[in-house]
A protein has these predicted regions:
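Channel- or pocket-lining gating/hinge segments that regulate access to a cavity or pore
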Residues: 176-178
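C-terminal binding/interaction regions
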Residues: 170
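Feature captures the catalytic cores and cofactor-binding loops of soluble hydro-lyases/lyases
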Residues: 1-166, 180-225
Length: 225
């Protein structure tokens, strides 16, 4: 996929509510990809979409010796590209943060669209001020350098029971997070965009004074199922 194609899909999915994407996946008979139990750092943050750039982390296997094994900066500088969305699996570790404002700013300047982690973040006011959407398990003031090491990049990870592969499409908004398998990106988009258009017509008919049943029937006739 070219850089232009990647950004095309990012822009298309950034225009879709997660509810429409989830409904499309249900309608296509795909395994549900909703990541439950994580929360936006800013309730007013914008919708974001991007290709999963996965990072697997765990507790350090050696005591702190002055060497930072988390390697966040190196991962961002060496691995990310425009249209990515950082997905960091910490296996539920929540007593330290996996990142803060400096890493978020560097990622944003690299064209990364946002961050998703089952760990914690810090400096969330600054991250929100950067307009960098992020979902996490919570917040923690302590940094990761003393406690965490990165053991894999661009590897399969599981967040809250959902398997995420490198290159999957991640969609995040104030409702939640949905993961679209990389091989189904086009198919899910076509269905989700049709659902979105149909709902727009339902709203228009409701504002005209029609009942919900009438509005749904009219919208289905206009847009299709």
């Amino acid at each position: 996929m070219t850089a232009e194609e990647r950004m095309m899909w990012v822009e298309r999915y950034s225009a879709l509510p997660t509810g429409n994407v989830a409904d499309a996946m249900d309608g296509l008979g795909l395994k549900r990809g909703s990541v439950l139990g994580l929360y936006p750092i800013d309730p007013s943050q914008k919708r974001a979409a991007g290709f999963a750039r996965t990072v697997l982390q765990k507790r350090r296997s050696t005591p702190w010796d002055g060497v930072n094994l988390a390697k966040h900066g190196k991962v961002i500088d060496d691995k990310t590209e425009p249209g990515d969305l950082l997905v960091i699996s910490m296996g539920g570790i929540t007593d330290v943060s996996t990142g803060g404002d400096l890493l978020a700013l560097r990622a944003k300047l690299r064209g990364v669209q946002g961050e998703l982690t089952d760990g914690c973040l810090r400096d969330v006011d600054d991250i929100a001020a950067f307009d960098f959407p992020a979902y996490s398990a919570g917040t923690a003031p302590n940094k990761s350098a003393y406690d965490i090491e990165t053991v894999g990049v661009d590897v399969p990870v599981t967040l809250c029971g959902v398997l995420i592969l490198p290159g999957d499409m991640i969609v995040m908004d104030r409702t939640g997070v949905v993961v679209v398998p990389s091989g189904k990106i086009a198919e899910v988009y076509e269905s989700a965009s049709r659902i979105a258009k149909r709902e727009e017509r339902v709203v228009a008919h409701l504002r005209e004074g029609k009942t919900l049943t009438e509005s749904r029937k009219l919208a289905a006739a206009e847009v299709g199922q």
